[in-house]
Amino acid sequence: EIGSGLVGSEMCIRDRNTGNVARTCAATGTRLHLVKPMGFEPDDKKLKRAGLDYWHLLDITYYENIDDFFEKTKGGKYFFFSTKGTHRHSDVEYPDNCYLLFGKETKGLPEELLMQHPDDTLRLPMIDEARSLNLSNSVAIAAYEVLRQWDYPALQNKGELHNHKWSDLNNMT
């Protein structure tokens, strides 16, 4: 297991984004934490389709609200992702048992929450003219930075070809 909680997606309102986030979590062995209200139902067809056939690999936990999330994940280290963050996501060290929190696609996390955690509010670099990145892309970028720092534990680090073997390259020269 990668950690007790890597990605917390708070109040995600687009079912396709959550499906894509779920697929990223499933493919990386990362637990997905969803905080209500979500704006969709977990059994939504679009949500299931976006996650494709990865649902059996997904470890998912639901929380009634943000207070419920913090109460049940005490002892973890929280990182808050926002376009308003002052620290880059790649400039921090991610400990075991960390949670990456993302807000609504349209509004982000509440500013009051960010003000309580200024040193742990992180930003993905982008040009000034861009409002934000897509939520599921942001989650993937952040999750893979954590996994890179952890040297991709339990993940397959080498792919195999379908019709050839990489070792065949040595025989061709």
PLM-predicted stretches and their roles:
Residues R31-P37:
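Short internal beta-strands
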Residues D44-E111:
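S-adenosyl-L-methionine/SAH cofactor-binding core of RNA-modifying enzymes
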Residues T18-A27:
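Histidine-anchored nucleotide/phosphate-binding helix
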Residues E1-V7:
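Single conserved hydrophobic/aromatic residue that forms the stacking wall/gate
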Residues H33, T61, F79, D120-L122:
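Hydrophobic/aromatic beta-strand patches that form the interior of the parallel beta-sheet core
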Residues Q116-S167:
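Structured adenosyl-cofactor binding patch, chiefly the S-adenosyl-L-methionine
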Residues M11-C12:
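Active-site loops and adjacent core secondary-structure elements that bind or stabilize anionic groups
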Residues V7, T28, A50, K74, ...:
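Short, structured coil segments at secondary-structure junctions
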